[in-house]
């Protein structure tokens, strides 16, 4: 699998502004260079794949872990921005595109402690199980109404009479519920 770096928009803006003001790295003082390096270390984290579907997989993994068993049904409610940006994106290691496989794998093999590398344990067997999970129509993905957050992911996992919920909002790894 390929590894991608995830960088927050605010961090990119800060670096861009710093570089515009300071012109180039070679004209910076040692202190300014250290500040930029520290900013990058603070704001850049490893991710496998595009951050939107991987953040959804992370939220699903957290809800499934909270449920304590394999979910029978998964409901995913997303902000328009996440839905738009995640639907047509390839999921590394799967040969597939879109949210359904990210959701299925998040539930089946995802580990929330891996953050945006939540699917790093993906195998061909897991992908086949994910395809079956999708074929059984166990996943419902829809737009969350009345959300002002651009980044909002809500997942409800159900199995029998048990229910678990997880919510990410504001940042790709910011679990708020």
Please place each PLM-identified region on the residue numbering:
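Generic N-terminal amphipathic, Lys/Arg-enriched alpha-helix
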Residues: 35-48
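Aromatic (phenylalanine/tyrosine) cluster motif
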Residues: 3-6, 16, 25-27
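Signature of multi-pass transmembrane helix bundles
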Residues: 135-177
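Alpha-helical support elements that line or immediately flank enzyme active sites
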Residues: 53-69
């Amino acid at each position: 699998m390929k590894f991608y770096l995830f960088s927050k928009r605010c961090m990119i803006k800060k670096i861009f502004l710093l570089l515009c003001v300071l012109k180039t790295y070679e004209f910076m003082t040692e202190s300014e260079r250290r500040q930029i390096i520290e900013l990058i270390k603070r704001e850049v984290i490893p991710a496998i794949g595009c951050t939107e579907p991987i953040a959804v997989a992370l939220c699903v993994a957290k809800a499934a872990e909270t449920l304590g068993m394999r979910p029978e049904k998964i409901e995913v409610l997303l902000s328009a921005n996440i839905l738009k940006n995640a639907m047509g994106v390839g999921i590394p290691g799967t040969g597939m595109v879109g949210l359904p496989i990210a959701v299925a794998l998040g539930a089946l093999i995802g580990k929330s402690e891996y953050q945006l590398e939540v699917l790093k344990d993906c195998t061909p067997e897991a992908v086949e199980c994910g395809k079956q999970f999708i074929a059984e129509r166990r996943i419902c993905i829809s737009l969350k109404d009345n959300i002002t957050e651009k980044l909002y992911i809500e997942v409800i996992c159900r199995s029998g009479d048990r229910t678990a919920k997880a919510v990410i909002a504001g940042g790709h790894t910011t679990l708020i519920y």
